[in-house]
Each structure stands twice: as C-alpha cells, then as structure tokens.
Amino acid sequence: MAIIPDKQDSSVLERKEQKLKPPSMYKVVLLNDDFTPMEFVVMVVQEYFKKDRETATQIMLKVHREGRGVCGVYTRDIASTKVEQVVTHARQAGHPLQCVMEEA
C-alpha cells in the first residue's frame, strides 16, 4: 500500500543570487633601515617577488630614498606569506630588514 500525499507541493524555490566581491588586496612593502645592504634587498626582491634585476634595483632605490617601497600587491594569504618569508630570510642572514603588508 502506497502513501499518497493529499496535496502536491507546487511551490518553487527561488534561487538567491550571491553577490561575490573580489578578495581584498594587500601591498607588500619593504621598509628602509641603515644596516641591510642594498644588494641583499635587490636579491630579496628578485627571489621572493620574481622581479628582474632592473626592477628590483628600482624598488631598492625607492626604499633607500623614500623609506619604503612596494614590491607587489597580493591577496591577504599570499601577502602574509611573502612578508613572513622575507623577514625570516633577512633574520637568517643577520639583517634587520622589515617587510609589512598594508591594505591596497
């Protein structure tokens, strides 16, 4: 014996559209100090931010002259990872180079 419902459900579920927004972006910024060699800064920019030597040198000079230089703009997780990698590498090499992230 089959159970048959008294009423058929004729309602239609409406699909709610989710508005997706792009992820927040963050600038990764190197800060100047009086002790980290310029060549080390160039190497860091080339290695961790995949910049060519000329671009890396320009970023290093901006850090040297203006006190800070943007190495790139990334999503939060990537920016955070790059900051950690740069600071860790600098400490292991005995340099006080600072790297921070700021909302773009």
Swiss-Prot record:
Name of one Pfam family that matches? ClpS
Q: Which residues form a coiled coil?
A: none
The record's listing under Gene3D superfamilies reads: 3.30.1390.10
Tell me the Gene Ontology biological-process terms attached to this UniProt entry.
protein catabolic process; proteolysis
- Cited NCBIfam families: PRK00033.1-5
Q: What does this protein do?
A: Involved in the modulation of the specificity of the ClpAP-mediated ATP-dependent protein degradation.
Instruction: Spell out the subunit comment.
Output: Binds to the N-terminal domain of the chaperone ClpA.
Provide the family line.
Answer: Belongs to the ClpS family.
Q: What is this protein called?
A: ATP-dependent Clp protease adapter protein ClpS
Q: Which organism is it from?
A: Burkholderia mallei (strain ATCC 23344)
Q: What is the lineage of its organism?
A: Bacteria, Pseudomonadati, Pseudomonadota, Betaproteobacteria, Burkholderiales
